């Protein structure tokens, strides 16, 4: 491809509304253009990268035995009402009416549509298992679209759905898809981690997320420094570092603590170690009209997903108001604790192993110091309530946890029978009786992968594409292309490289465009290999080669350029 025949739309300045680096660089490199809030047009440069992601995804899905389909983006409300999600999904679901006043939605996901397809097309266990996927545009009406393609309203997704006669069959396909996802992200050259995850609003019994590691990621992921254990921070089990509770060395005493409403104030005002303090958080209980207290150590954070999953706690999690707390306990936030607490409480595992700790006294401006379980009060119900922190023991018993930021680019779920039961999706089983199908679903944010790859691979000059993702393998930059010698050598090399199967962008812009601008554009776009043709180099029988990942260029004999590039370019 020649730049004279291509839409090369690079920008010198960063648009003011672009915050994250992927958004900035995709705009500056001429990959995308904003149409409206959360909506983007893919330009030729960006579309070349997007298609490469799609092709790898498609190849791995086909290799895993999945069948490609294409479902409508517009879905009838009746299907969503059948599953119960018409009401549950909330304002992110864009609802529309046709000219006949029939209700539809713009699909954010396709569980209902595929389940409807399965119940109409499948009738026997002999047709199972079956796994169907599509690569298609989705729409979620995000309240605040931001970060470019990282959190837009319209996006491209690969979503697959599998149907099974039993859990064992689902597990087999789930494992195969897990491996297929690992293959996809490995082939794309990304530094990623598959992690255990909460099933969230999709539902089901088990799930894994796939995260590209990047400092700009929105999610915290925890993983062992020794084993393969990894989990989303919402899911990671918090194992106490202490093996047993230390013996009591202090007597419990009531202390005046005026204007001490936070852990920091307690620590600084009374010289306490933060590890000897606790936080008491009051939430709505599962029993209507009741409250329950959740207690974590002062230096730990409540994991709201874990809390909401407790049978004693209302879901979704709802914090009690100050008025509700005062009515139930007689004291306000900042003065609460387990001693003489008039409502039930659950303590975190780490709290259960504390001794000589400080807690609110359930009396305004007073705390108990030197509190010890069993001696001063019975140990209440114990549960895993907190987020893990770096240095915690790995739940698999191997090593300790590290925590890094990640960008979620894939998610796989074992749905079970959530949708098939709601929509009566059955086949005749081996015994001739109806069997409700067990389902799995598997998503990859195809357009998000492009942005995540940039978040992980960039420098001060622009994008750092690898060979698998780059819009072009080679930037061929002639200096003084208008001269006969340079043009002939460049055109001959261009023909040889394209004949060898390389994707080449020949920068044939005229002499008004300086070499510096050409080089800067190619580095901004992130083409991984640059070859420069010049009068001086040709006089010496050489071309100049520079890797995008390196700072220094090198001379390569013209006769050796093909084998030289073949040794460096992975395809």
Curated annotation (Swiss-Prot):
Location within or outside the cell: Cytoplasm
GO molecular function, one term: ATP binding
Record EC number: 6.1.1.15
Xref: Pfam families: HGTP_anticodon, tRNA-synt_2b, tRNA_edit
Gene3D superfamilies given in the database record: Anticodon-binding domain, Bira Bifunctional Protein, Domain 2, YbaK/aminoacyl-tRNA synthetase-associated domain
Reaction catalysis annotation: tRNA(Pro) + L-proline + ATP = L-prolyl-tRNA(Pro) + AMP + diphosphate
GO cellular component: cytosol
Coiled coil: none
Purpose of the protein: Catalyzes the attachment of proline to tRNA(Pro) in a two-step reaction: proline is first activated by ATP to form Pro-AMP and then transferred to the acceptor end of tRNA(Pro). As ProRS can inadvertently accommodate and process non-cognate amino acids such as alanine and cysteine, to avoid such errors it has two additional distinct editing activities against alanine. One activity is designated as 'pretransfer' editing and involves the tRNA(Pro)-independent hydrolysis of activated Ala-AMP.
UniProt note: domains: Consists of three domains: the N-terminal catalytic domain, the editing domain and the C-terminal anticodon-binding domain.
The protein's name in its UniProt record: Proline--tRNA ligase
């Amino acid at each position: 491809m020649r730049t004279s025949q291509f839409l090369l739309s690079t920008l010198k300045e960063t648009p003011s509304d672009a915050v994250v680096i992927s958004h900035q660089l995709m705009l500056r490199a001429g990959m995308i253009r904003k149409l409206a809030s959360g909506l983007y047009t893919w330009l030729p440069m960006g579309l070349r990268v997007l298609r490469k992601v799609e092709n790898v995804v498609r190849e791995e899905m086909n290799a895993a035995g999945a069948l490609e389909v294409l479902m409508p983006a517009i879905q009838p409300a009746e299907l969503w009402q059948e599953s119960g999600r018409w009401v549950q999904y909330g304002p992110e679901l864009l609802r529309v009416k046709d000219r006949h006043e029939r209700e539809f939605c713009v699909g954010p996901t396709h569980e209902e549509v595929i389940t409807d397809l399965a119940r109409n097309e499948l009738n026997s266990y002999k047709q199972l298992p079956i796994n169907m996927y599509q690569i298609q545009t989705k729409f979620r009406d995000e309240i605040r679209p931001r970060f470019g393609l990282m959190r837009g309203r319209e996006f491209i997704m690969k979503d697959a759905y599998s149907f099974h006669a039993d859990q064992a069959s689902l597990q087999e396909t789930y494992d195969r898809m897990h491996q297929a996802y690992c293959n996809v992200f490995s082939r794309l050259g990304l530094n990623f981690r598959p992690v255990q995850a909460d099933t969230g609003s999709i539902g089901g019994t088990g799930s894994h997320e796939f995260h590209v590691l990047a400092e700009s990621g929105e999610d915290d992921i925890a993983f062992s420094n020794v084993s393969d254990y990894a989990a989303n921070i919402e899911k990671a089990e918090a194992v106490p570092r202490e093996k047993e509770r230390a013996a009591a060395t202090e007597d419990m005493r009531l202390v005046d603590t005026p204007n001490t409403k936070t852990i920091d104030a307690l620590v600084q005002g009374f010289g306490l170690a933060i590890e000897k303090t606790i936080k008491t958080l009051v939430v709505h209980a599962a029993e209507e009209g009741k409250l329950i207290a959740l207690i974590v150590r002062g230096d730990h954070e409540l994991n709201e997903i874990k809390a909401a999953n407790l049978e004693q706690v209302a879901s979704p999690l709802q914090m009690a108001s100050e008025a509700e707390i005062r009515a139930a306990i007689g004291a306000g936030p900042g003065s609460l604790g387990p001693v003489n607490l008039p409502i039930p409480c659950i303590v975190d595992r780490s709290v259960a192993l504390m001794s000589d700790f400080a807690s609110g006294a359930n009396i305004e401006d007073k705390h108990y110091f030197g509190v010890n379980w069993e001696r001063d009060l019975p140990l209440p119900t114990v549960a895993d309530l907190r987020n893990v922190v770096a240095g915690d023991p790995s739940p698999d018993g191997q090593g300790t946890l590290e925590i890094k930021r990640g960008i979620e680019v894939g998610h796989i779920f074992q749905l079970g029978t959530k949708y098939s039961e709601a929509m009566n999706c059955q086949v005749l089983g081996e015994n001739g009786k109806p069997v409700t199908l067990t389902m799995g679903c598997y998503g990859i944010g195809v357009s998000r992968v492009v942005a995540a790859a940039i978040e992980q691979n960039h420098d001060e000059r622009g994008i750092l594409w690898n060979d698998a993702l780059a819009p072009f393998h080679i930037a061929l930059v002639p200096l003084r292309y208008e001269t006969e010698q340079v043009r002939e050598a460049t055109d001959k090399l261009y023909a040889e490289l394209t004949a060898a199967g390389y994707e080449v962008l020949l920068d044939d812009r005229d002499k008004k465009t300086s070499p510096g601008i050409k080089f800067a554009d190619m580095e901004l776009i992130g083409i991984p290999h640059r070859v420069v043709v010049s009068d001086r180099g040709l006089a010496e029988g050489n071309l100049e080669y520079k890797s995008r990942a390196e700072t220094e260029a090198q001379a390569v004999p013209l006769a050796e350029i093909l084998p030289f590039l073949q040794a460096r370019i992975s395809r």
